[in-house]
Each structure stands twice: as C-alpha cells, then as structure tokens.
C-alpha cells in the first residue's frame, strides 16, 4: 500500500471512530447501565450483585432503577387487573420466568432539585419526595483510565457515607448512579470508603423520546388497589427510619405481610427462632436519626 493510501485509510478510520462516538458525546438523552455490588448484612462476606442497574438521563430529569425490576412491574401491570386477578396469560408466563434482581428501589430526580424515592423489597413499598441537594465534591488532581475513558477522581461526604467517584468529561452530563451527581462529567464508577457499595459502568446507549420510561416509572409510585396495604408514604426521615426498622425486625415485617410466624423450619421438623441479621443500608440509619 502506498504512503498516500495508508494516510487515507487511517483518516477514514479516525472519522468513523468520531462518527460512532458522536451520538454519545452530544446526545441529551442517554441510558447507562451499571453493575451494582453491595454487602447486605453486617459480619458476613456475602456480596450481592445486580448487573442491570440503569440510569436514564433525559432533559431535566433522571431515573435510576433495575432493568429487571422495571420489566417485572411492567409485566405485572399487564398480567393482573386491579383486583389482582390474572387477565393476560402471556404476560403472566413471562413474569414467572423472569429472574429477579436484589435491588428493587426506584429513584427519580426532576429539574435537579426534587427527588422521588421508592424503597422496596418487592412486596413492601415505602416512598417519599424530598428536595434534592447534590453532593459537595472535592475534585482531585490527576487522570485515570477507566474502560477506555479518561476519568478524574472526586470525593464527598453524602447522606452518611464517604464516597469516591470517577467521572469523565468526555460525556458531558453531571448525572451518576443512585443519588450521586453534580460533577463536570458522567460518573462512571463510585464506591463508598468502606467498600460496602460499588457502582461500575458497563455500557451506554442513546435513547429516543419514544423510548422514555420516566412516566411509566412514575406510575409505579402509585399503589394499585390490590397492593395498597403494602404501600407507605411520608417524609424522607419517616420512610428511612421505617424501612430500617422493618428490614431489621423480622416479626414486624411478617406482621405487616400477614405471616403468623418468623420461625425457621429445621431439617428434623422442629421450629426455631430466626437468628437476627443486621442489614447494611446504603443510607445509614444514623443519618435519618440526625435529619
């Protein structure tokens, strides 16, 4: 190949790379998928991982949710009527075959200043709306390469935990996973200082107006008639404290769900009290108590 031909080939490859990246660099609406790893219980090495935590970035609003949970709730709306009766066998069949993730929370942020949060275990749903205040970040010097992007490191103390984040200015969005945002570029990775919670970018795509899920996600905050007894709403402090109490008190959770006993069935057929496990919440209960 001649020198001129080689130059033209390299130029064409460069232009193609720019064209492929352009939609992400200029798009105002993006869908970012993260892997979310966390330790659910104290004094245990168990690690949960959700591979499909999704951040939708739209004009003036963001949504953070599990793709699997979104599909589950969407199919549930089709499969059942308001009385909980099965009305669509096809949707019901897909729902029963769906593998559920462990994180079932929804977070919607509108206009950068109002957060709607639903804490859920799949049955109990606690929701609140509150003024959203972005973390106050300290940006450190230096560049870091992360999955093909040049990133910068930032730290903050936010909602009871110390956080470390890596963001890229190559994607001009101040959004990030969970309630983390406010940096001069998309947050690709974030973890707390104790390494109990970790969000890691997996892939990104542009979304069209017709593919917006925001309104549908908003509808999941409204209880269906057959689920009303499992929905609670109030201030952020009330719901944060209630969620912590329910998840750390098996007898209270069972009482709310109408389960008579919280005992464990042993192999010999006898019953014994469940050993209490202390959950680790991404927002520590101490934060809610001090609020």
Model-assigned labels for residue ranges:
Residues 1-34:
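Bacterial Sec-dependent N-terminal signal peptides
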């Amino acid at each position: 190949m001649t020198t001129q031909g080689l130059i033209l080939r390299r130029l064409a490859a460069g232009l193609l790379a720019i064209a492929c990246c352009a939609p992400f660099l200029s798009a105002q609406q993006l869908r970012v998928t993260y892997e979310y790893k966390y330790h659910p219980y104290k004094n245990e090495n168990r690690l949960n991982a959700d591979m499909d935590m999704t951040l939708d970035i739209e004009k003036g609003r963001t949504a953070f949710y599990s793709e699997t949970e979104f599909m589950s709730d969407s199919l549930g709306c089709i499969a059942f009527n308001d009385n909980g009766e099965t009305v669509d066998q096809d949707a019901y069949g897909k729902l029963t075959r769906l593998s559920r993730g462990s994180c079932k929370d929804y977070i919607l942020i509108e206009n950068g200043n109002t957060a709607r949060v639903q804490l859920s275990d799949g049955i109990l749903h606690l929701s609140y709306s509150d003024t959203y205040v972005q973390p106050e970040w300290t940006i450190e010097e230096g560049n870091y390469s992360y999955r093909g992007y040049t990133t910068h490191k930032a730290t903050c103390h936010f909602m009871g935990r110390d956080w470390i984040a890596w963001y890229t200015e190559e994607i001009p969005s101040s959004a990030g996973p969970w309630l983390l945002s406010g940096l001069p570029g998309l947050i690709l990775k974030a973890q707390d200082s104790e390494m109990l919670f970790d969000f890691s970018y997996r892939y990104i795509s542009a979304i069209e107006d017709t593919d917006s899920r925001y309104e549908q996600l908003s509808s999941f905050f409204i209880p269906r008639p057959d689920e009303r007894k499992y929905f609670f709403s109030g201030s952020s402090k009330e719901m944060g404290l209630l969620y912590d109490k329910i998840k750390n008190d098996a007898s209270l959770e069972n009482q709310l769900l109408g389960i008579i006993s919280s005992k464990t069935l042993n192999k010999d057929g006898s019953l014994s009290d469940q050993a209490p496990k202390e959950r680790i919440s991404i927002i520590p209960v101490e934060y809610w108590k001090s609020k």
